[in-house]
Amino acid sequence: MFVRFARFEGTDPATLDDRVERMRQEIESVKAGNPPEGMPPEAGEVLRSSVVRVLTVVDHSDGTEGSAVFCATEEDLKRVDELLSAMSPPSAGDGHRVDVAHYEVVMDVEV
């Protein structure tokens, strides 16, 4: 398992929950095979076929967030990274990406 972790800053804390809900709806649309408006169908198919899990964490006090996108293979991760790196948060107040890193998941334990 491989993960792409992106950090964002500058999101308006007052709109953070709305942004997360919008992302959740977009992910559900992609899962259903109906990419959201503005996303080419090919991009939706890459995400649908390559992403196995998305985890988002936020700090409501300052509007920072992190997004972990999990892929089964390193090849899938590279395809997803290329696609996501070309995207930016769509709205004013949605902040900007400040860092992206790739990792291999070597332990995932629930306790």
Can you name each region flagged by the protein language model?
Residues 89-90:
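Helix-adjacent hinge/juxtasegments
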Residues 1-66, 72-83, 93-111:
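Short S/T/G/P-rich N-terminal loop/turn motif that feeds into the first structured element of a domain
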